């Protein structure tokens, strides 16, 4: 594109006159351009250098930078035949990126039409196609679009031959437009050439094809010029008011492009109100009033309101409630991502940043706010280049640049503290997390904004619930951010609920879709009579749906008018959002759930036979937690279940998970025999840095983070290494544990159950006196004696600080023969269910059941021998018969024991045996 400018017959005199003006290049480049401009004759023609002199001239001119403008202009210095003329680089240094884009689009339009030149008409198409500049906006407001303009251009000049050179030259009129655009910029007091100046130059030239195109499209050139001047004036006023500092009125394109004026937004009322944070805002004001190193850096956890402090300062400045040191200043937030974006060539980023710093220094009324200030480090750095932090350091130290930074504690430590030279230039301002009471006040200040957005109302109870519930249940985020998110999502939920179609309308919509589908099929099948009937039905349904929607809107409108500003968000909505986020039930207990909780022991006893003490203790803990009476800073409950093997310690935890938490999989189970060695203990919280598995997290901490409301079972706790007990002290007391990455995991909504076989030998010795021959009082006294002995054993095995943190130590009883018989019924039912899947009906006789209990009863081993007896006597016999094809799908089978004690399997479809079996007992 730039080579096309070489075709100029003379250097514009206005450009040649720029020899004495400021030139944005190195000293060497300035001298080269001055030399070339001075070498012109009175007609301002310049003969190209040849040979070695030409190469040197090229090198001298091109080696000045890598900006977009210089890239375009550099192409003009390549060797050309004698008599060739070009536009000097100084003109392109003044082009904005939008103006460069216009010229490039003009070339594309020339190629599209097959023309080997760029005239005024192509520049006009480029101005329209650019789309975002002042020129494009004015032309669009006049009703001129790219499609119509292309048609008019093609009507006037037609299409070219199709052969287009790589370098398309500019026509003399197009060069005249460029010259006039520079003059227009000077007259407006601008030190740059934008798309608006190109349009003004185009209108001023007034004799090219572009003028005819505008005339044909019905646009008045004088009206266009007036609109451009007006928009340029408004832009200047806006920039002067928001960036330039009022009196100077100078335009600051770099700051305007990469920054957002918070003070202007505050004046327009577009910022959320800032409640509290007075000490932090005053400290920031004090630091900004210093002579040097006047750069505060807001440091705090994510979501505590660091950006809000900068917005609060902008609001104070807008209201005039600040000391004279910063009165009238503008807070501009800098978008670092936008500043870096698109810098493809070396030097572009540095040039943008230097321009931005120059504009801030010239204004002397700008306070720069950089959110995520740690992104300065490394921004724009490439091989051999320096990053943004090092470019800004001198200005930050001397007080030439007032900058407010904001970053998190981790990022500050990771990036800024590693660079002491940068750290000393920023003065840290700690931003603590607000308390629950402060958060409630913040929510009250924001309430009006969210009510307007969601078109509903919040009560004070909603705001209190949002602050308290978010503090209690959402542990991995910080106030006030998580509380604000709660009321925001609750408002969205209520609004969507009220905006839904009534059920009747949904049914009609479903029917309408089906009828439309049938109508289309009828049309395709050329059954037009049926299609006509369906069309009539379709129109009828549409009318009904429209009537229902209108009626629903009227009802909603009436409700809104009755409630002043719309639906009401309730505390239950806030609770529902917390539950959906965390999985923790915080809603009020419903009638059905209340009945379930009251009958919890009865339900658990359908699976757990005996062990009343343990079942009652767990049920009490769940009820206490569900109604909100538990200590909010400790787990729901922590138990240690001790007793002989096979009496239901682990089974009770599984039954609780299945009944109350949904399934056995909802339980987090850790077999402590896997943590017997010292080096395996770290698996609970994650490997330390430098070890394999560091990034994966701990088995315990990660499981609880994903499912904070659950049962955690530490099976066979006495098998664990003693270091595990040290780790569990803070879980049992404070309900928290820090993993290997320093993240705090919340155990306040978990039920901790530890099982142990410590004391089983004592129970076995004393168990001989527990049986059918003892009455109730003797059983209780024997159990109490054994319980005290087991407790002593536990005290000898575990350290006192560990046992002292447990809520209860529950000793399980040995199973009696009657209890084993009930357990046998439960186990047999499980076998029946497995066979029912295979369509085999199984029944057992009373004799068989007694045989199973006799073989499976062992007071020392609990119910596990019973499981082995059922497997040997029933499952093995059934498996042999099924493999021998004696039992098939659909058969009814009775299992009995003959007079010799052998198990017999009787198939109901194979006839009656000679010795009839007794009546089967349903289990």
Swiss-Prot record:
Residues the record lists as binding ATP: 300-307, 643-650
Repeat 2, as annotated region: 170-234
Domain of life: Eukaryota
Subcellular localization(s) per the UniProt record: Plastid, Chloroplast
Residues annotated as domain Clp R: 92-234
Region of interest: I: 255-502
GO molecular function terms attached to this record: ATP binding; ATP hydrolysis activity
PROSITE patterns according to UniProt: CLP_R, CLPAB_1, CLPAB_2, UVR
Domain UVR: 509-544
Region of interest (Repeat 1), ranges: 95-160
GO cellular component, one term: chloroplast
InterPro entries: AAA+_ATPase, ATPase_AAA_core, Clp_ATPase_C, Clp_N_dom_sf, Clp_R_dom, ClpA/B, ClpA/B_CS1, ClpA/B_CS2
Keyword Chaperone: yes
Region (II): 569-760
Name recorded for this polypeptide: ATP-dependent Clp protease ATP-binding subunit ClpA homolog CD4B, chloroplastic
Family, as annotated: Belongs to the ClpA/ClpB family.
Function: May interact with a ClpP-like protease involved in degradation of denatured proteins in the chloroplast.
Keywords for this protein: ATP-binding, Chaperone, Chloroplast, Nucleotide-binding, Plastid, Repeat, Transit peptide
